[in-house]
Design a protein with these regions (language model features):
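ATP-dependent NMP and nucleoside kinases share a basic, alpha-helical "lid"
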Residues: 46, 72, 85-125, 135
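Divalent metal-dependent catalytic cores for phosphoryl transfer on phosphate-bearing substrates
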Residues: 206-315
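Conserved GTP-binding G-domain of TRAFAC-class P-loop NTPases and closely related GTPase folds
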Residues: 10-15, 20, 28, 113-168
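Acidic/His-rich, divalent-metal-binding segments that scaffold phosphate/diphosphate chemistry
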Residues: 156-238
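Conserved substrate/cofactor phosphate-moiety recognition/catalytic segment
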Residues: 24-76
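Phosphate-binding P-loop
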Residues: 2-8, 71
């Protein structure tokens, strides 16, 4: 799905956790399409003598963006090789190239979480799973169009995925339903099983008049990450930290489960799965916070996201 604008420089921003294969992919793109690659790890190696040293990140990114912007201004296409999993990081990337007429592409890595952790464990400069969870998974948000992208690339969503036979989708869906419908959330905030909660969320959205397939699909799958993030405290109550991010990663690694035959529809479903917990944070936020996200997302997406959050709450 990766395409370039031949009439202007292209700016590709890699988005992915440490160990997801960003650097290999970025270098392959750079070599194949003759693009300059700017790697935060390489700048750390120069400035700090170690790609793992985070102590001088301000200086690292100041120099990186200075050089990257210069290349774009010279009409060269570039790849930014950094994690960029947070909204804050991507908005900074956009701010740093402000005023340059270029084609902006978010390239989202779809490597399964288990593979990421395994790869990291074998690296010379290990990040560690605890740090991956605390510093990267916790801040992961799927790119939103309102950030300024001309294109969002999720390489796992291929024509084969979009043309997935119904029988294959049905098998995947039934296997998932067997897990979620019997999954006791073991939390006083939830009286329904996981599958029943997700189904009720979708029903509530339908009853409000929403007929958008992407949003209803997202509702049916929005808490799927809870299958992989359950922890239990000393009182025997379960918690599901980072479940929205984990669910998004899972769906990107198994996109046939979305059951959608349109690429943009798949992107929209992934957005709502990833952002559904943000709906609650936004609603509890200040007027300034609400204005910020309305400005970023646009009125339609912002309003739909809050409706999604309301349905999620009502379905408990």
């Amino acid at each position: 799905m990766l395409s370039f604008n031949p009439d202007k420089p292209n700016f590709i921003v890699m988005v992915g956790l440490p160990g997801s294969g960003k650097t290999t992919t970025a270098n392959n793109i750079g070599e194949r399409f003759k693009m300059d690659v700017f790697s935060s790890d390489e700048y750390r190696s120069i400035i700090c003598d170690s790609p793992a040293d985070q102590s001088k990140n301000d200086e690292v990114f100041k120099r990186l963006y200075h050089d990257l912007r210069y290349s774009l201004e010279q009409g060269k296409s570039v790849v930014l090789d950094a994690t960029n999993v947070s909204l804050k990081a991507r908005l900074r990337a956009m701010a740093e190239i402000q005023g340059i007429n270029c084609h902006k592409i978010a390239y989202v890595m779809t490597t399964p979480y288990e593979t990421i952790v395994e790869r990291d464990s074998k690296r010379r400069w290990k990040v560690g799973e605890d740090v991956i969870k605390k510093n990267f998974l916790r801040s992961f948000l799927f790119p939103a169009w309102g950030e300024g992208w001309d294109e969002i690339v999720v390489p796992s969503i291929t024509r084969e995925v979009l043309d997935c036979p119904y029988k294959e989708f049905e098998t995947l869906w039934n296997d998932l339903a067997a897990k979620t419908m019997n999954f006791n959330q073991n939390n006083p905030y939830h009286s329904l099983t996981l599958g029943a909660h997700m189904g009720k969320t979708a029903d509530i959205l339908c009853n409000t008049g929403i007929r958008n397939d992407s949003i209803i699909t997202a509702a049916m799958l929005h808490d799927i990450g809870k299958l992989y993030t359950q922890t239990t405290d000393e009182q025997g109550i379960s918690h599901y930290y980072n479940h929205a991010a984990m669910g998004t990663l899972y769906l990107m690694s198994c996109p046939k489960l979305l059951g959608l035959d349109n690429y943009d529809a798949c992107l929209q479903a992934l957005f709502y799965v990833s952002w559904h917990m943000m709906a609650h944070d936004i609603k509890k936020g200040t007027d300034k916070t609400k204005s910020k996200y309305r400005r970023i997302l646009g009125n339609t997406t912002y309003d739909l996201l809050l409706k999604f959050g309301d349905a999620d709450t009502e379905a408990h």
